[in-house]
Every structure is written in structure tokens, then in C-alpha cells.
């Protein structure tokens, strides 16, 4: 593993600028003109100001994670806020916090009217809107920070990756654990042979913490005047608005937050969390296209929503990778490593029937025989984590983000924290660390903002060139769940060879007026 030949493992009232009736022709016309007005796609900041100037940021989706994504950019100029719902507490709070920002309900109007004033956008909408919003901004050469999962379909992930590369857009996906020193240390040491050839990866999460396995509700409720339901649906098929299943039900049906379990809008527990929890092994093992994906749902699986839990197998072939010797931006100093085939297991939700659980515990975690050392380390298996098993040892990460890890080499009796294991001293730090502070969320955003100011997309550790591939892999698990069978995947052709019925879930047919183009 230490040489080239050894194998490796101005706020206005909402109504004054709100409309979901912007025509597609007018929007394309105006966005094309705005894009053409930019000097070779370079952000406005770099065309007329020095690098110490503040960026003009527009934030699309300001509730939930959108609140923290907006606040992470607070030291820049927040010039626009956009959200389809003006009844939320986030709307009241954020519009007050950023009084100089103009408010919109419709992101298309925002880009149409303010495109020349915007350097970058953050996108924190439901999953089904990510690609639509991101592509519109990128066509206008705006830098993009988009929440995970990057997209809702495999086709969209590949589409955004290609666009970002061709237009040289500064991009970042919101898997903030990427900013952590611990994750980067795990990646470089595993690549350099810390635990030898890795043959198994097990990743688990306590999600979903929202409703799943439900049928579409009957009936229809009046759409609140504060919500643009047509715009909220975006590319998804039209359906009646329904706020609650009954007047006594405290849980919303679609929004906010609980859209995650619906197949038309979210990506279930896998899409919501795998871009965090699989991030570290994906990078460390240089995972490319899987050849097989097989999902086993727990409980009811219907055509409307994801199941209460699942176990999914991803099979990856042997592969080669080129990694930097010292620094990922020194492109002429690389070495080739080789990885053996690897099986990645994903676990989410729970299995309430002890008779059906086999070797797994009730919270749907890896087999008990694989987690004994974890229990010895901390008394129990955590609700989320990942385990990499190599022929020279094991790495265990105990959280959602891969930000910390423990090492147990072959012949050792117990796990030790990576900062206290002597074996790591032989592996140099060759991946640059994020210098922007201890808060991974703020540091992750600052890395993106700094890259925009330098016009260097490669400075973003979660740029779309990398994270679109991660998203694509995980979304294939959603496809396998929806078709109800194993998928034999042809990555280069983007085709399920044995399952033609998977095609609509790989590239969906968007509602009229919402096609990617």
C-alpha cells in the first residue's frame, strides 16, 4: 500500500413579488440574456471588486436546514430570500434578521429580476426541487450550495455534475461532515493502507424520524393563502393539497419536513442520511459505479412512500484510483492504488418482529457478531455509524458524519481513538484541512464562499464533481426499493440491465413546464 505496485485496499411584502405563473418562455429568455451578460461566467464579485469584497447571496428555501444555510453566509450580503410558504416561523425570523434582502416566493422571478446582482445561491428546498433550482442558477453562472441529497434522481445527479464541470461553477453539497479533520484523516489513512484491503462496509442510521409507509390521504383541503402549492409541487405530478389527515392529527402530511417519506418529493432515510454516513467510506475506498443493488424493505412498500425500514446491499467491483501524494491540487503528483471488490450494507429504520430479524437487533443495525467490539468500546451500538472491515483491521465511526473514528488493527483487542493510535503516525496528512473553524456547518459554507472569491471550484471538498457520484450511488438504492428487485447496473450507460421498469425512477418525467433543459 505504500508504493504504486502494491494493491490497496430590501424586503417587500410577499404578494408584491410572488407568482408561480412566470412563463417558461419568459424565464428561459431572461435567464439566457442574464447568462450572456456575464463575462465568461465569472461571478460579479470577480469582475469588478477585490477579493475582500462581500458576495451577494440569494437563499432559496429558508426554513429547516435553510435557516442555518442562510445564517452561515451572514457575513456576506444576503440580498434575496425565497420560500414558497410565508406562514412559517422561519419566514418571520429570517426576513426580520435580513431586512435588506428582497423576498420572493418564486425562485424564477428572483433570478429573473435580480440575476445581475447575485453571485451565489443556497438551495434548501425539498429534494424534488434541488436539480430544477440548481440548474437554473448554474445556467446563469451562479455559484451553488445545495443541500443533500444533491438530487432526487440518478439522471439529475449526472446532469448537475456535467453542468458544473463544463461551466466551471463553484459548487458544494451540504454534507458538512466533509469539513471535519477526522473525516479527512480517515480518508487518507484508509487509502494509504491503515486497515489493508477493505471487503465490507456497514452503515446504519436511526432514520426515518418522520412518517413513512403511508398511503396518500383521501380528500382535499383549501390551500393556505400563505402557501404556493403549485410552486411547492414543482416538477412532481399535481395532487390535491391536504394539511392533516383529520383535525385532531398534530402531524402535517406534506410540509414542512415530512415530505421526506413521499416518493414524489423525498428520498426516504437512505437519501436523507447516506450522503452523510456513507461519505467517508465512499471517499476512502474510491467507490465508483456499483454493479448490483438489492434492497429489502421492512413492512409495507407501496407506490406512494418509502418503507419504515430497509436493508440494502451495494456490490462494487475491484477498481483502481489515482490519489495525490501530498496535496489534492498538485495534479502532477499522484500515485495509483488498487482496491478489491467491496460489499456495502445499508440499514435504516427498524424491524419490530423478532422472529424476522435474523442476526440483527431490533433497531436494524449490523449483525451482532460484527458489533461486539463496538459494544465493548462504548456500551452499545450507536443509533448511527459506519464500520469498515479490512484484512488488516477495522475502522468504526460512531456518528452521522464520519467526523471521528476508532481503529482496531489485526491482532489488537480493542478499538482506540484515531488520535491515540500509534499506527497513524506513519501516514502523512496529505488532504488539506478546512481552516475555517470548529463548527463543521460554518466551516463547510466558508470553504465554498472562499472558493467563490478565488474562482477555484477545486477548493470545495464536496463539489458536485465528487458528491454527484455519491448521490447517484445512494439513489440507486431508492430505485431498487421502488422496483422491488435486485438491479444489475450499467453505470456508463445509466441503465438497469435486468430491470427496464426502473427507467422512470432513474430519469423521471417531470410535470409540464418543469423539464431540465
Model-derived regions, located:
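N-terminal Rossmann-like NAD(P) cofactor-binding module of classical short-chain dehydrogenase/reductase
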Residues: 121-122
Amino acid at each position: 500500500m505504500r508504493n504504486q505496485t502494491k494493491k490497496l485496499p430590501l424586503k417587500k411584502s410577499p404578494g408584491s413579488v410572488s407568482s408561480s405563473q412566470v412563463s417558461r418562455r419568459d424565464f428561459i429568455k431572461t435567464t439566457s440574456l442574464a447568462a450572456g451578460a456575464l463575462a465568461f461566467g465569472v461571478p460579479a464579485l470577480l469582475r469588478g471588486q477585490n477579493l475582500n469584497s462581500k458576495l451577494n447571496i440569494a437563499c432559496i428555501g429558508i426554513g429547516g436546514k435553510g435557516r442555518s444555510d442562510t445564517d452561515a453566509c451572514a457575513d456576506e450580503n444576503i440580498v434575496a430570500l425565497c420560500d414558497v410558504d410565508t406562514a412559517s416561523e422561519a419566514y418571520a425570523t429570517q426576513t426580520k434578521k435580513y431586512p435588506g434582502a428582497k423576498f420572493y416566493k418564486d425562485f424564477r422571478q428572483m433570478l429573473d429580476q435580480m440575476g445581475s446582482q447575485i453571485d451565489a445561491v443556497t438551495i434548501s428546498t425539498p429534494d424534488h426541487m434541488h436539480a430544477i433550482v440548481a440548474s437554473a442558477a448554474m445556467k446563469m453562472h451562479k455559484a451553488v450550495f445545495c443541500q443533500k441529497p444533491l438530487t432526487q434522481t440518478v439522471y439529475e445527479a449526472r446532469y448537475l455534475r456535467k453542468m458544473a464541470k463544463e461551466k466551471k461553477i463553484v459548487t458544494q453539497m451540504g454534507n458538512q461532515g466533509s469539513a471535519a479533520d477526522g473525516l479527512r484523516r480517515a480518508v487518507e489513512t484508509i487509502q494509504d493502507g491503515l486497515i489493508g484491503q477493505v471487503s465490507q462496509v456497514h452503515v446504519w442510521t436511526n432514520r426515518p424520524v418522520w412518517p413513512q409507509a403511508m398511503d396518500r390521504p383521501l380528500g382535499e383541503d383549501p390551500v393556505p393563502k400563505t402557501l404556493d402549492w403549485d410552486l411547492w409541487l414543482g416538477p412532481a405530478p399535481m395532487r390535491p393539497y391536504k394539511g392533516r389527515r383529520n383535525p385532531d392529527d398534530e402531524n402535517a402530511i406534506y410540509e414542512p419536513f415530512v415530505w421526506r417519506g413521499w416518493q414524489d418529493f423525498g428520498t426516504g432515510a437512505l437519501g436523507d442520511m447516506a450522503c452523510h454516513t456513507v461519505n467517508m467510506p465512499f471517499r476512502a475506498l474510491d467507490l465508483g459505479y456499483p454493479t448490483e443493488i438489492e434492497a429489502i424493505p421492512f413492512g409495507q412498500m407501496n407506490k406512494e412512500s418509502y418503507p419504515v425500514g430497509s436493508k440494502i446491499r451495494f456490490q462494487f467491483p475491484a477498481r483502481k484510483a489515482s490519489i495525490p501524494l501530498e496535496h489534492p491540487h498538485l495534479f502532477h503528483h499522484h500515485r495509483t492504488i488498487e482496491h478489491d471488490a467491496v460489499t456495502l450494507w445499508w440499514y435504516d429504520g427498524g424491524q419490530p418482529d423478532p422472529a424476522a430479524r435474523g442476526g440483527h437487533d431490533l433497531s436494524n443495525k449490523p449483525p451482532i457478531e460484527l458489533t461486539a467490539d463496538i459494544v465493548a468500546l462504548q456500551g452499545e451500538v450507536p443509533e448511527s455509524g459506519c464500520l469498515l472491515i479490512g484484512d488488516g483491521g477495522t475502522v468504526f465511526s460512531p456518528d452521522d458524519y464520519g467526523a471521528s473514528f476508532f481503529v482496531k488493527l489485526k491482532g489488537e483487542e480493542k478499538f482506540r481513538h484515531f488520535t491515540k493510535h500509534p499506527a497513524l503516525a506513519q501516514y502523512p496528512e496529505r488532504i488539506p484541512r478546512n481552516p475555517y473553524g470548529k463548527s463543521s456547518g460554518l466551516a463547510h459554507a466558508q470553504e465554498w464562499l472562499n472558493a467563490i472569491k478565488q474562482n477555484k471550484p477545486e477548493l470545495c471538498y464536496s463539489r458536485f464533481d465528487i458528491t454527484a457520484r455519491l448521490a447517484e450511488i445512494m439513489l440507486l438504492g431508492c430505485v431498487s426499493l421502488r422496483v422491488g428487485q435486485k438491479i444489475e447496473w450499467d453505470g456508463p450507460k445509466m441503465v438497469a440491465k435486468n430491470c427496464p421498469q426502473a427507467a422512470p425512477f432513474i430519469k423521471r418525467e417531470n410535470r409540464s413546464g418543469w423539464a431540465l433543459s
